[in-house]
Amino acid sequence: MIGLIQRVSEANVTVAGEVIGEIGKGMLVLLGVEKEDGDAEIEKLANKLCRYRMFSDEDGKMNLNIEQVGGEILVVSQFTLVADTQKGNRPGFSRGATPEHGEAIYKKFVHALRAKGMAVSTGEFGADMQVGLVNDGPVTFHFNV
């Protein structure tokens, strides 16, 4: 499971011209699901994101987590994160989960974050989406669990 995490002052996701998810201060999570991902990866990444200190304290140090700043999370599925880009000029997706498995893991991941008390908005799995964001910093982290 791959998560590309961006600290944002705001973010939204649009499908067919309609905003279906939006947040204020918080994190945008672009989530790529691999074939072998399961409950262990879901819990590991969900726990990591809830505890990860990527928000600034009063001294400007990255010392606060999402809960401590009252932030929100926007989760958007992005299968291109699992692409193999090592050979050739076209990405390969052999590591990626099937659409059925990917959607199930995506939904379980969102549920895991909500079960930890996080305010979570989402995109629409498998849809053609437009994602808007204001990256605060910029601050971006790549997690591979």
From Swiss-Prot:
GO MF term set: D-tyrosyl-tRNA(Tyr) deacylase activity; Gly-tRNA(Ala) deacylase activity; Ser(Gly)-tRNA(Ala) hydrolase activity; tRNA binding
Domain remarks in the Swiss-Prot or TrEMBL record: A Gly-cisPro motif from one monomer fits into the active site of the other monomer to allow specific chiral rejection of L-amino acids.
Short sequence motif named Gly-cisPro motif, important for rejection of L-amino acids, residue ranges: 137-138
Subunit structure: Homodimer.
Cited InterPro entries: Daa-tRNA_deacyls_DTD, DTD-like_sf
Protein name: D-aminoacyl-tRNA deacylase
Organism expressing this protein natively: Alteromonas mediterranea (strain DSM 17117 / CIP 110805 / LMG 28347 / Deep ecotype)
GO CC term (a single one): cytoplasm
Family to which this protein belongs: Belongs to the DTD family.
